[in-house]
Every structure is written in structure tokens, then in C-alpha cells.
């Protein structure tokens, strides 16, 4: 029969549970980090972790992902962009008015911009104040090629 006084102070024919750490004995609380926590045992260090459907070594061959640059999906899919006809430059997919990574500027405009750039730096170097557009000129960065 189970002793109702087990683990309690007082006359006790059975000594408290000393040899088994991890029990719920107030005199001997369970250790903070038991070597094997109660409950489902974790896999040993050498065991594979992760999804059993995909072994830890990875799939034997890489799975192609459709739409990934550099990987054309197999099947009757049309290419994302039709190849340009020979001799015709590819059409810029950006909407008109949007600035792309490389804006093509004609030689006249380039010269004009270089001049303005030099002027701006010179202006900022010599004047301590009026740095931020107190005397702003009406030159905008639109690519309208005016005749100079």
C-alpha cells in the first residue's frame, strides 16, 4: 500500500526518494537541466533532423523552379519575353516617363549636363551659405533636348 506520509517530515518507514532525481519530491527537487528530459526523447546527435520527405542530404538532383532566372521550365510554356528580332533593339518594358537603371542621353544633352554639374560643384565650394537652393536655378533634370 502507498504510504500517505511519504516525503513528509515525521516518522516514515520509507526514506524519501533519493536515488531517482526528477521525481516530484519537495525535499529533492528535479534538476534544472536533466540529461534526458521527461517526455518524448529527442533524437541522438547523429540522427537526421528536418522533414522526412526531404532527406538531410538534400534531394539527389536540384528541383528546377519555374520562373527562376537561369532555369527554363520544361514543357509547352512560351518564354517569358519573346526574343527580339535580329537588328531590332529590345523594347523597354518600363512605362513612358519612368526612369530606368540606364537613361540614354544624346551627346548634346550630356555636354549640357556635365557643364551644369561642374558649375554646381564650383558654386557650392566657394559659398558657405546658400548651399541648399536659396538661389535655385530653374534647371530641371528632364531629358528635353533643347537646341543650345
Swiss-Prot record:
Subcellular location: Nucleus
Low complexity bias: start-end ranges: 136-148
GO cellular component: cytosol; nucleoplasm
Biased composition (Basic residues): 109-135
Composition bias, Pro residues: 27-67, 75-93
Lipoprotein in keyword set: no
Record region (Disordered): 1-148
Keywords noted in UniProt: Nucleus, Transcription, Transcription regulation
Coiled coil stretches, renumbered: none
Main subcellular location of this protein, as a coarse class: nucleus
Function per UniProt: Negatively regulates TSP1 expression at the level of transcription. This down-regulation was shown to reduce taxane-induced apoptosis.
Name listed for the protein in its UniProt record: Proline-rich protein 13
Gene this protein is translated from: PRR13
Amino acid at each position: 500500500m502507498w504510504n500517505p506520509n511519504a516525503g513528509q517530515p515525521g516518522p516514515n518507514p520509507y526514506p524519501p526518494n533519493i536515488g531517482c532525481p526528477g521525481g516530484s519530491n519537495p525535499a529533492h527537487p528535479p534538476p534544472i537541466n536533466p540529461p534526458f528530459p521527461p517526455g518524448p526523447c529527442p533524437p541522438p546527435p547523429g540522427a537526421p533532423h528536418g522533414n522526412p520527405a526531404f532527406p538531410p542530404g538534400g534531394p539527389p538532383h536540384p528541383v528546377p523552379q519555374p520562373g527562376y532566372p537561369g532555369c527554363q521550365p520544361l514543357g509547352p510554356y512560351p518564354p517569358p519575353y519573346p526574343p527580339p528580332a535580329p537588328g531590332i533593339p529590345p523594347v523597354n518594358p518600363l512605362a513612358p516617363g519612368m526612369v530606368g537603371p540606364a537613361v540614354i542621353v544624346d551627346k548634346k544633352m550630356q555636354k549640357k549636363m556635365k557643364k551644369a554639374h561642374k558649375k554646381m560643384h564650383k558654386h557650392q565650394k566657394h559659398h558657405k551659405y546658400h548651399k541648399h537652393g536659396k538661389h535655385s536655378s530653374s534647371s530641371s533634370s528632364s531629358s528635353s533636348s533643347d537646341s543650345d
